[in-house]
C-alpha cells in the first residue's frame, strides 16, 4: 500500500504485509517513509495503525511482527506507539559506521491490539 499525505496526496512511502501465513494467522509488516522531511511527523505511526487494524480486523491475523535495527530509535518509538512490544534482539547483527548494532524483534498479538483499541472499536461500531 502507498503512504500519502492528507494535504496534497503526495506519495511519501509504502507499507506492506510480507509472507502472510493463513494457517498460523501471522505475517511480517514492512514500512518505509522515503523522503526524510516527512519522517517524524506521524505518517508512519498512522500508516502502521491503519495496517494493523486491517490485518487484525479484516484479515483475522493473530500476530504481526517486524524487525528493526537498534540505531533506528525513531522507528522503534513509532512501533511502540502503534502497539508493538519488543520480544527479543540479535546482538551485534549489523556493522554500521564502525559500530555493532542489534536487530530488534517486535510483534503485536491480536488480543493485545484489541485491548489497546477497545474504545476506538466501540466508537466505530456505534457510528455504523
Task: Enumerate the predicted regions with their spans.
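Acetyl-CoA-dependent GNAT
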Residues: 1-38, 109-111, 122-124, 128
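Conserved G/P- and acidic residue-centered "switch" motifs that form tight phosphate/ATP-binding loops
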Residues: 9, 42, 72, 98
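Short, conserved glycine- and acidic-residue-centered signature motifs
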Residues: 22, 44, 48, 99-102
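Conserved acetyl-CoA-binding loop-helix of GNAT-fold acetyltransferases
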Residues: 34, 40-54, 73-81
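Short, charged, solvent-exposed linker or helix-capping segments at domain edges/interfaces
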Residues: 40-42, 115-121
